[in-house]
């Protein structure tokens, strides 16, 4: 490099004159410079104008898609238990200037300058997270940078386990989640099962409850380093104390994944996992009703006094923080963290407690009405925000019913139930009460929702009976071509929409909507 620089310098004999001493040339350059400056100023004003223009003006196509989604949310039944309607104040924070800042690192230790207010927002979010779940900050810490629930779980695994160490979690067809390490006999579906060895525990298929006795026996043989207590389609409460005992025997970490139920836990209407777990993860957009993000809570401080009488401290904090950044993420989403801080403040209010109480009452009434109509619920009922309907006794599956539900403006999702062999054509439908409760639905409304669901299932059975083949595509073809059945679906859709339109919108006003019919 030095030789190259010497050659370059020796080749330059004298300075190059950019301007002639000729006066005419100077006047020409001066006028050119003035013209260029004027053009630059004009260009600058154009992009600033563009940056400050509204969405309707800049991109009417995207604006129209958003308006269509508003109409869908207003006119339909949102029954997917992992969904909710977040508040206007949260959306204002998420759509704020906090999205503009890069802030790799943690408060007080960033790799970028200009983060004094980002630090304030993240620190406030952490403080409110601990307060929302009534945690002692000397015994618990929290990372609020994780982007979503699945990454949060993977970050915990990579922080606390070595590659190919062992994880036990609830089996996906029995109500578990992909991020807990799902695999089939022939394929590792989740990346977790690629990098770690995973083994499921399951429900007792006779009762629909987790088989804790078998879990304990399996743990003795498998010797897991971490056991997950958490689910995505389990309608009953976890026995955290029982899993804690199993973890103690195996010297395993207990990870509670409360993604679905964290809002209920924050409100104190169901038992908290924090008394028993070492680490707790949650998404923030389900029952918690915040923006789309995640949190990782971890124990810190004194763990135990060992046999030598020495204090042993928890070491989760540094390991988890390093797994999040720089291990698996770069810059955090500061707009999401700011919106989460707002949601966590709401979680400490009397209104929030009343809302979560109503979520449980609504789900209980929903389950009661479905049972009265002859539906089979996995575990026979519910203790939380969701019901899992096993449709096998009705002679139909979740995929076919889901297709009809969508056409009549009821959003629910097909779901595996114990005994299923296909995740694409499962035997169940999963439904929950958080979203519609946010819109003001109470018990009598969910009794009505159950009636509309029952009508949709009956239509699905008629379509199945008229289908020429046994495949899902044959069902869809009949659904799209049979005019009589289409008329029935149209009538049911009108009934659903008229009922749903009575209730308030969340996050936007009806008067501002483009599509009101």
From Swiss-Prot:
Keyword Iron-sulfur: no
Residue positions, PTM N6-(pyridoxal phosphate)lysine: 286
One GO term (biological process): tetrahydrofolate interconversion
UniProt main location, coarse: mitochondrion
InterPro entries tied to this protein: PyrdxlP-dep_Trfase (IPR015424), PyrdxlP-dep_Trfase_major (IPR015421), PyrdxlP-dep_Trfase_small (IPR015422), Ser_HO-MeTrfase (IPR001085), Ser_HO-MeTrfase-like (IPR049943), Ser_HO-MeTrfase_PLP_BS (IPR019798), SHMT-like_dom (IPR039429)
SUPFAM superfamilies (alphabetical): PLP-dependent transferases (SSF53383)
Domain of life of the native organism: Eukaryota
Activity regulation annotation text: Inhibited by the antifolate drugs methotrexate and pemetrexed.
Family matches, as PROSITE patterns: SHMT
UniProt: pemetrexed binding residues: 82, 102, 104, 112, 148-150, 177, 232, 260, 331, 430
Pathway(s) this gene product operates in, as recorded in its UniProt entry: One-carbon metabolism; tetrahydrofolate interconversion
Catalytic activity of the protein: (6R)-5,10-methylene-5,6,7,8-tetrahydrofolate + glycine + H2O = (6S)-5,6,7,8-tetrahydrofolate + L-serine
Enzyme Commission identifier(s): 2.1.2.1
Protein localization: Mitochondrion
CDD domains with a match to the protein in the record: SHMT (cd00378)
Residues that bind methotrexate: 104, 184-186, 414
Tissue note: Ubiquitous. Mainly expressed in the shoot apical meristem and roots. Also detected in the leaf vasculature, especially in the protoxylem and adjacent cell layers.
Family: Belongs to the SHMT family.
Protein name: Serine hydroxymethyltransferase 2, mitochondrial
């Amino acid at each position: 490099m030095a030789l190259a620089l010497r050659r370059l310098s020796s080749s330059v004999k004298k300075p190059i004159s950019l301007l002639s001493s000729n006066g005419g040339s100077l006047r020409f350059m001066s006028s050119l410079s003035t013209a260029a400056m004027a053009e630059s100023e004009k260009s600058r004003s154009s992009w600033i104008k563009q940056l400050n223009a509204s969405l309707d003006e800049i991109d009417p196509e995207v604006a129209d898609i958003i308006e269509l989604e508003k109409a869908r949310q207003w006119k339909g039944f949102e029954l997917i238990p992992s969904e909710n309607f977040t508040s206007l104040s949260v959306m204002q924070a998420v759509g704020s200037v906090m999205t503009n800042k890069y802030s790799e690192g943690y408060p007080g230790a960033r790799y970028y300058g200009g983060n004094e207010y980002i630090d304030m927002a993240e620190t406030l979010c952490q403080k409110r997270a601990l307060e929302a779940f009534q945690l002692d900050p000397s015994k618990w810490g929290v990372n609020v940078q994780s982007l979503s629930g699945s990454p949060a779980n993977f970050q915990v695994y990579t922080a606390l386990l070595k590659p190919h160490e062992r994880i036990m979690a609830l089996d996906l067809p029995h109500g578990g989640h992909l991020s807990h390490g799902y695999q089939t006999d022939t394929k590792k579906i989740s990346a977790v099962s690629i990098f770690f060895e995973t083994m499921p525990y399951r429900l007792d298929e006779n009762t629909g409850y987790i088989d804790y006795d078998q879990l304990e026996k399996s743990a003795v043989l498998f010797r897991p380093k971490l056991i997950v207590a958490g689910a995505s389609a389990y309608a009953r409460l976890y026995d955290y104390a029982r899993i804690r005992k199993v973890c103690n025997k195996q010297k395993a970490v207990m990870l509670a994944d409360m993604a679905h139920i964290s809002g209920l836990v924050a409100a104190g209407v169901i038992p908290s996992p924090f008394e028993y777990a070492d680490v707790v993860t949650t998404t923030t957009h389900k029952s918690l009703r915040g923006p789309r993000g995640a949190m990782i809570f971890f124990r810190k401080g004194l763990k135990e006094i060992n046999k030598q009488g020495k204090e042993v401290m928890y070491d989760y904090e540094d390991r988890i923080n390093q797994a999040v950044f720089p291990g698996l993420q770069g810059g955090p989403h500061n707009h999401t963290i700011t919106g989460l801080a707002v949601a966590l403040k709401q979680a400490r209010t009397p209104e929030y407690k009343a809302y979560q109480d109503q979520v449980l009452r609504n789900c209980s009434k929903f389950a009661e009405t479905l049972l009265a109509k002859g539906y089979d619920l996995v575990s026979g009922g519910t203790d939380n925000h969701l019901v899992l309907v096993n449709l096998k006794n009705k002679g139909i599956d979740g995929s076919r019913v889901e297709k009809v539900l969508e056409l009549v403006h009821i959003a629910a999702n097909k779901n595996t139930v114990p005994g299923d062999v296909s995740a694409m054509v499962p035997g169940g439908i999963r439904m929950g009460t958080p979203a519609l409760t946010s819109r003001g639905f109470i018990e009598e409304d969910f009794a009505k929702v159950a009636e509309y669901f029952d009508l949709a299932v009956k239509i699905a059975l008629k379509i199945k009976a008229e289908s020429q083949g046994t495949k899902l595509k044959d069902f869809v073809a009949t659904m799209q071509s049979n005019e009589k059945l289409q008329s029935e679906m149209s009538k049911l859709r009108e009934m659903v929409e008229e009922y749903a339109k009575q209730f308030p919108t969340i996050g936007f006003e009806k008067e501002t909507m483009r599509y009101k019919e």
